[in-house]
Structure formats: structure tokens, C-alpha cells
């Protein structure tokens, strides 16, 4: 009898030990899960804090870039002014640059007066690497895209060509609203292949003529139909002693004729050429970069001026990596 009770007691003790062991395992699992939850929550908190910090830095960089725009847009602030680049405590800074929107060829203006000005585009495309006949064909296609009629220019492309490609609403028969539209024109891919940076040569926002005080030698050469060496010499004189464009020692031409004389344009030809160039464009392009910590934000603004009053006609923003 005593042996039976002893055996039963031993059995009960074994069951209790088993239950305690199971409970311990369960507790360890719970502790592990809680530890994992705490770790995950901590990680999420760090991510959220980092995200908040980045958002704050982005916002600060945007404010700094906007400050640069506001200063550069003032009519009394000129290129090279020290106010255009400023640094602050903590490493924050902004840097703004002013340029003329007329330092690029106005594509719509050239096509509007295509009878006299198409030579500018033909010569530019030829210099970029197209054959003469290819350059002529591309310009024909550009003219047909913007003119109001459906008559083909030489061997250009009008509605029937695009219709056969199931592009039923092409061409638009109006001036370009965006440089992206130029990519829709027949054979323009040849220009893109020859010069992937072709956009840097064109604008749709200027007053029309090329700003001879700020345009690069390549564009002055094709617009004025002069030798590239003459255009390079003009740019060298224009850039002053430091040979750096956009600084305070730059020489500005106040008269188009003086610039054309320097380029060696014959008097009988100067009247036609003078319609393509100017000494100042009413639109200014302002590029401002704001920096806060490791974050940089770039604002690009084009301002159209009438006297001392400016109107923003283009605005773009991007975060720089």
C-alpha cells in the first residue's frame, strides 16, 4: 500500500515538473516575442525619426533655394553679385545663378520666319553631324509641324505621312508648347542621336532673338552665319580679363551693330542678321540650389520682365542626389 502511494506521489511530481517545464518554455517564447516586438518598434522609431529628419532637411533646402530665387529675381541684382551665394551656420547654404533665356535659339521664332531663318537650323544640325540633305529634311519636317496648312514643304511631312503611321492628330500645326513635342517630328531622332544634349541649344521662352551678350560661340556662329573663330573671339572679349562668363568684369555690347562689326558681318548682310540677335532678352533664367546637411534641392525659374516687374513663366524643382 505504501509502495503504491509512493509511486503515485512520484508520478504526480513528474507531471508537475513537466507542467513547470512547459510553462517555462512558454514564458521564454513570450519573452522572445516581446523582445522581437520591442526591437521592431525601436527600428521603426529610428526609421521614422530619420524620415522626419530628412523631411526637415528637404524643407530647409527648399527654403534656401527659394531664398536664392528671390534675391536673384530682384532687378538690382546682377550676375556675379556676392549676394547670390551665401553660407550659414550648420553647413546650410544656397547658390544662385542668373542667365539670359535668350542665350539659346528660340525654335518657334526661327520656324515662324523659316524662309530666312531655316539656314540657322540647317547649319546647326550639320555641325552636329547630320549630312546636309538630312539637315534640310529635318528642318522641312519641323516647318510642316508648326505651319497652319497641310501643304508639304519640299519633302517634309504633313498629315498624310503621320496618318499612315496611325498618328491621327499629328502634326499639331501650331508652335511648339514644349521641347518634348519636338521628339514627335519625323526624323528628329537623327538630331537626338547626333547630339543627345540638343535641348541646351533651344528655348521656347525667350523674346525671340539670340542674346549676343550671353549665347555660346556655337550658336552665335550659326545665327550670324559667321566663322566659328570670329564667334569665339567675340566671346573671349565679352568674358573679360578673367575669361569667366557671368562675372562682374564681363563686357556687354549695348549695340547689336558693334557686335556684328566685330564678327565681320558685311554691311549689306547685317540688316538681315540683326533681326536674329539682341543685346538683352526680357526673360531671365534663374537656377538656385539650396543645401541643408546632405540634402540639395534645385529650383529653376524663368522670369519675364516688363520694366522692374517680373512674372514667372516657368518653374521646375528637383532633388539632387
Model region roles, listed by residue range:
Residues 2-8, 12-16, 20-321:
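Compositionally biased linear targeting/interaction segments
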Amino acid at each position: 500500500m505504501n509502495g503504491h502511494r509512493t509511486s503515485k506521489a512520484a508520478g504526480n511530481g513528474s507531471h508537475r515538473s513537466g507542467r513547470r517545464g512547459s510553462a517555462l518554455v512558454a514564458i521564454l517564447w513570450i519573452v522572445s516575442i516581446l523582445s522581437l516586438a520591442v526591437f521592431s518598434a525601436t527600428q521603426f522609431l529610428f526609421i521614422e525619426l530619420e524620415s522626419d529628419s530628412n523631411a526637415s532637411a528637404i524643407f530647409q533646402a527648399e527654403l534656401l533655394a527659394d531664398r536664392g530665387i528671390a534675391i536673384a529675381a530682384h532687378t538690382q541684382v546682377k550676375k556675379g553679385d556676392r549676394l547670390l551665394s551665401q553660407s550659414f551656420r550648420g553647413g546650410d547654404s544656397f547658390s544662385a545663378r542668373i542667365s539670359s533665356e535668350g542665350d539659346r535659339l528660340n525654335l518657334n521664332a526661327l520656324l515662324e520666319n523659316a524662309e530666312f531663318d531655316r539656314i540657322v537650323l540647317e547649319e546647326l544640325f550639320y555641325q552636329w553631324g547630320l549630312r546636309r540633305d538630312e539637315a534640310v529634311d529635318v528642318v522641312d519636317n519641323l516647318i510642316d509641324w508648326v505651319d497652319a496648312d497641310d501643304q508639304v514643304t519640299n519633302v517634309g511631312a504633313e498629315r498624310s505621312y503621320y496618318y499612315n503611321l496611325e498618328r491621327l492628330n499629328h502634326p499639331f500645326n501650331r508652335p511648339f508648347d514644349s521641347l518634348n513635342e519636338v521628339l514627335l517630328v519625323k526624323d528628329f531622332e537623327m538630331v537626338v542621336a547626333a547630339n543627345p544634349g540638343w535641348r541646351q541649344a533651344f528655348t521656347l521662352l525667350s523674346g525671340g532673338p539670340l542674346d549676343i551678350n550671353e549665347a555660346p560661340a556655337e550658336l552665335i556662329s550659326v545665327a550670324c552665319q559667321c566663322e566659328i573663330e570670329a564667334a569665339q573671339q567675340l566671346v573671349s572679349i565679352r568674358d573679360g580679363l578673367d575669361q569667366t562668363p557671368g562675372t562682374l568684369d564681363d563686357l556687354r555690347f549695348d549695340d547689336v551693330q558693334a557686335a556684328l562689326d566685330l564678327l565681320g558681318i558685311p554691311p549689306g548682310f547685317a540688316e538681315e542678321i540683326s533681326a536674329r540677335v539682341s543685346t538683352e532678352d526680357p526673360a531671365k533664367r534663374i537656377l538656385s540650389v539650396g543645401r541643408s546637411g546632405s540634402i540639395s534641392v534645385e529650383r529653376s525659374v524663368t522670369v519675364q520682365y516688363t520694366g522692374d516687374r517680373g512674372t514667372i513663366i516657368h518653374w521646375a524643382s528637383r532633388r539632387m542626389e
